[in-house]
Amino acid sequence: MRIYSLNGEQWLMRQAGQERWRQATVPGSVYADLMRDGTLPDPFYRENELEAFALLENDFVYQRVFEAEETMLQSRKVLLRCEGLDTLAHVSLNGQPVGYADNMHITRERDVKPLLLPGENVLEIRFDSPIRYALSEYEKRPGWCSTDAIPGFQHIRKAHCMFGWDWGPRLP
C-alpha cells in the first residue's frame, strides 16, 4: 500500500458563487485561510466574531489539482481518505460526486480509481454553511438549546462548542 498525501498549501478556496480563488491550507479552516489572506480579522479579538459569523452564513469550496501517478492508475483500488471534514461537505473528483459528509467525527473513505484520469485531476470539496443548516433544522424541529449557542446546533454532528458556549465565541 502506498500513501499519497494531498495535505499542504497547494489548495485553493473560494466563497461559493464568487470567482476569486484564494490560497488555502489543508488541514485547516475557512477562518484560518481568510485570516491569512487578510479578508477576515482575528475572530477571537473584540467584536470580530460578528464579522466571521456573517461570512460563515455562506458556502465555501476547496479545490486541489493533482497529478495521478502511473502507480495509482495501475492500482486495483485507490482510496480517497478524508479525516475531519468539518461537517456538511460534498466531495467530487473530476466533476463526479464521490461522497457527502454530514458528521465531522467520522473518517470517510471511497474508492476513486474509476474516476482518476491520467495526468491532471481536480478534487473539490464544497462545504455548506453549518449556520444555515442548524437554523433550518431548528425551524423544522425546535427544541431547547443553550442560550449561548446558535439555535439548532443540536441537529448537526459537529463539535457543539463551535456554535458558542459560555466561554467561547460562535464560530461554527
Whereabouts are the PLM-identified features?
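Accessory beta-strand-rich segments of carbohydrate-active enzymes
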Residues: R2-G17, S29-G38, A52, E57-P172
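Solvent-exposed adhesion/ligand-recognition segments of exported proteins
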Residues: R22-P27
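N-terminal glycine-rich cofactor-binding segment
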Residues: P43-F53
